[in-house]
Amino acid sequence: MGCVYRRDILGFHRACPSLMVPATSFTNGIPMSPYPATLNIQVPNALDLILSRRSGSAKAMKGPGPNAEQLQRILAAGVRVPDHGKLTPWRFILFEGEGRTRMGAILAEVASGIPDVSADRMQQEAARFLRAPVVIGVVSRLREHIPTPVWEQELSAGAVCMNILMASHAMGFVANWVTEWCAYHPKVLERIGLRPTERIAGFIYIGHPADVLEDRPRPAVEAITTRF
């Protein structure tokens, strides 16, 4: 079993716990991954990483994207979020390789039903998911008739999206969290396998920036903070 890295007042050091908590299932039947019995990990400069994160436009991305191992780690980071009731109210749809082309065909087909749709629009839709090497669809799947409010379940899905952005940034990629029209069109959602209780929290495009990214102004914290 691999070691975990820990940091305390004495500094950053490595610890190799002798036990792993075995995989279990939550009450909704979703299998859980094994996890260390000892988990107290702090990453040096994590705050600097957060403070340097910014989005890059899906329209200005290039390859390469994350490989299989990197993508697995990005998804693993995605699920490290608050989840009231341990419901796992989210799941992933991966669009890679030819899968992006198939998604484009679906979008073009649905768009063809728009009155007087132009050929340029059809080409745009066919190429929409080709803008980045990898696209992760984050699906919010609501658990109904339970104590956990719907709003909290939706917030958890949003936290998944944010973790994916941060993990991508940590690996040197750029990511863009969008929805666009295809996240709300019932025909598109049906074609990609969403159920009536599911919604797209975001399509996250991941790649490398085609141009140098420049930061943008951020809100002054003092202007949006009150003390009660």
Sequence positions of predicted segments:
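Conserved hydrophobic/aromatic beta-strand scaffold that supports enzyme active sites
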Residues: 49, 135-139, 203-205, 225
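Small-aliphatic-rich amphipathic alpha-helix that forms the alpha element of a beta-alpha
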Residues: 78, 136, 142-190
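Phosphate/diphosphate-binding glycine-rich loops and adjacent basic-rich segments that engage nucleotide
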Residues: 215-228
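A glycine-rich helix N-cap at a beta->alpha junction
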Residues: 192-216
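N-terminal amphipathic, basic helical "cap/leader" segment at the start of enzyme domains
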Residues: 26-131, 228
